[in-house]
Amino acid sequence: PFNPSTKIDIQTVERNYLKVQIVDVAGRLVNTLVDNELDAGYHVVRWNGLDVSGQSMPSGMYFIQVQSGDRMNTQKIILLK
């Protein structure tokens, strides 16, 4: 669980397009944190618990979706206020 923010550690082995999104349990997009090419290496992405319009999200379960090329990785996170 996290409050008020969480970090996502990402390591890439080569320069690649990366998309990191937060979605709710219904699969609706909450926020896009990264949507561009990143150099190879270690990257830290933070989510502050806000949606795309800057509104604070309620406590609950969310999913971090990390897409790199044709790969998609999803991880569950819990926001507690």
Could you tell me what each predicted segment is?
Residues F2-K81:
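C-terminal outer-membrane/trafficking sorting elements
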